[in-house]
Amino acid sequence: MSTVVAEGVIPVAAPARDTGAFDPLVELRGVWTPDLADRYLPIPGMPPVKYECQDGHLIVSPYEGSANTYAAYRMLTLMEPPARELGCRVYPTLNVQLGINRWIQPDFAVLNEPARGRIWIPGTRALLVGECVSPSSRVADRIDKPAMCAEAGIEYFMRVEVSYTKNHAEITLLRLGDHGDYEVHAKALAGDTLETREPFPLRFDPAELLED
């Protein structure tokens, strides 16, 4: 059978009521926490996936394709030097906890201080989180995750969109405003220049996120 999660369909094992076995995807629906995630994730037999949680509901999604993986890698290399100058650290996917029953695994993140081996990163330690948008994550990356990150008080949210068929690359850097919502701080398309002094100096053409 299949369980519908977020905007995709991920094959999972039959429910516990059919087999008599404990199935965390069924039994823990709506009550997931980091403690339960530490105990039951990853799900045995599942393909490699990202596990995120919104208000106790587990969201399972496949890992990114090569276009987004490369874009995230390039963002890491571009941000690492200026972020380190401020004492910050840049990371690929982390478990960023946004509440007692909320967490995300952003494609990249900048923390105010080194993680030093931590598995769960409090949202208060994140200066910036970034997502590379894919067709299956468009709603989550544009609406759901920014709303949760804003509520958690993360000052910056970066959205990256790349397409090789359209030769398109776009970066939108959002900053938390006075009313608790994100506002556009900087934005650029391939062929233009993204330039910002905050949260640290960046100046580059988004086309650099596309492999040549």
Give residue ranges: language-model regions.
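Gly/Pro/Ser/Thr-rich low-complexity, intrinsically disordered segments predominantly at protein N-termini
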Residues: M1-D212
